[in-house]
């Protein structure tokens, strides 16, 4: 009651004519984060729904929790296993020793705590750097700060390596927010996924920090390829020899970015999004169908020089960022197709493209990021042709 009174008391200072009128978006951001927005429709029709933008974004953040928790655990696990051979150094190791947690990879709490020390700084920098530019654009344009940035910041954090320098983290999210969203008008008007735009910028601007064998496990001197990179060079059949079974990849105890290693965690999040009706199942069906069909075709064609031709669809499903991208990027409602038939086509295009990039392009074993951005670009065109086809069909029916 006291907090509500506080907001009501200072609100006139931020309204039109008030002393801090220009900073109303900042006030509205904090107030609507704590309380349900008071905005209602002023004229008919009055559509009632149990869900609003704030709740949608909250649900998406909730859906990422399994990926966050397992991402911290796996980052700590991979780090602690490497420390056993290469030793510990840096301020994080000092904090771990001060807390008496230790570096035992068999201790889940030690793994989570160590992973938290990598996840938290990246997330804080992402939230602050991107949030500053969100507020700047909101103040200049005179509109509210949308909750969509909470989702963008979380997804962005989950798709970067744990070793990413913090200044690069800030640069990437700023690029994603400004170029991927705000230049098109802000949340709801962007046709590209801002988190992926930021990640793509870092990949092409600083490839040595975003790929390779030394960026996944934050231990000095350690080098280890991802399962997808091993498959690209030696074939997926060699993965068990490297200690990577299919179930390891499904659970996520392999090298990779924070949130992308665990297919299980991503599927739990996707199931939640389907239950609350935020994710559209047509996008998922299309993406899975495109991936399964094209990977099966390449399996049938075969290749003596490219081992990726032999990778079956169920390995594509658990390796790289496919599952995470399917759960949180493909189903993102703003940048995806909006027609029902278009959603099948859009999903199938992404499923086709991710296999195409992984198999045909030898320089880039992970293809989900580029495949989704490619799909984002074509989504409006797909919807256009679907709508035009429907118009022509209805016109012929009425002749």
Task: Indicate where each model-derived feature is located.
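A generic, well-ordered mixed alpha/beta core segment in the N-terminal half of proteins
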Residues: 146-218
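N-terminal signal-anchor module of multipass membrane proteins
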Residues: 1-119, 123
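Loop-to-transmembrane alpha-helix initiation sites
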Residues: 170, 191-195, 314-321, 343, ...
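Central hydrophobic cores of alpha-helical transmembrane segments in multi-pass inner-membrane proteins
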Residues: 122-136, 173-181
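Structural signature of hydrophobic alpha-helical transmembrane segments
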Residues: 112-126, 163-172, 253-263, 309-322
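A beta-strand-loop signature enriched in Asp, Gly, Thr, and Trp
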Residues: 284-340
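Long hydrophobic alpha-helical segments that form multi-pass transmembrane helix bundles
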Residues: 185-267
């Amino acid at each position: 009651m006291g907090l509500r009174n506080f907001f009501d008391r200072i609100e006139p200072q931020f309204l039109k004519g008030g002393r801090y009128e220009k900073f109303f978006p900042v006030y509205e951001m904090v107030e609507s984060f704590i309380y349900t927005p008071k905005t209602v429709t002023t004229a008919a029709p009055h559509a009632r729904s149990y869900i609003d933008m704030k709740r949608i974004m909250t649900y998406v953040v909730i859906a990422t929790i399994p990926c966050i928790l397992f991402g911290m655990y796996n980052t700590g696990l991979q780090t602690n296993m490497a420390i056993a051979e290469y030793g510990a150094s840096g301020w994080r190791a000092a904090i771990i020793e001060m807390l008496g947690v230790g570096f035992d990879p068999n201790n889940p709490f030690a793994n989570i705590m160590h992973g938290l020390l990598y996840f938290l700084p990246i997330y804080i920098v992402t939230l602050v750097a991107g949030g500053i530019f969100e507020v700047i654009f909101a103040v200049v344009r005179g509109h509210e700060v949308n909750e969509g940035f909470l989702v963008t910041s979380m997804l962005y954090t989950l798709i970067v390596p744990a070793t990413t320098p913090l200044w690069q983290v800030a640069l990437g999210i700023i690029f994603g927010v400004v170029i991927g969203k705000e230049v098109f008008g802000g949340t709801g008007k962007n046709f590209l996924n801002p988190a992926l735009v930021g990640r793509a910028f870092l990949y092409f601007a600083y490839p040595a920090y975003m790929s390779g064998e030394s960026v996944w496990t934050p231990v000095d001197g350690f080098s280890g390829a991802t399962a997808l990179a091993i498959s690209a060079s030696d074939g997926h059949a060699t993965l068990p020899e490297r200690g990577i079974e299919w179930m390891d990849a499904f659970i996520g105890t392999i090298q990779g970015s924070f949130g992308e290693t665990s297919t299980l965690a991503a599927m739990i999040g996707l199931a939640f999004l389907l239950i609350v009706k935020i994710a559209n199942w047509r996008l998922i069906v299309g993406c899975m169908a495109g991936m399964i069909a094209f990977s099966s075709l390449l399996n049938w064609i075969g290749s003596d020089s490219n081992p990726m031709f032999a990778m079956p669809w169920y390995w594509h499903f658990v390796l790289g960022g496919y599952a995470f991208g399917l759960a949180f990027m493909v189903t993102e409602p703003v940048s995806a197709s909006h027609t029902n038939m278009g959603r099948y086509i859009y999903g199938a295009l992404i499923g086709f493209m991710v296999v195409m990039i992984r198999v045909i392009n030898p320089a880039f074993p992970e293809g989900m990021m580029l495949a989704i951005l490619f799909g984002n670009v074509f989504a409006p065109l797909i919807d256009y042709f679907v709508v035009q086809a429907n118009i022509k069909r209805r016109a012929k029916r009425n002749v």
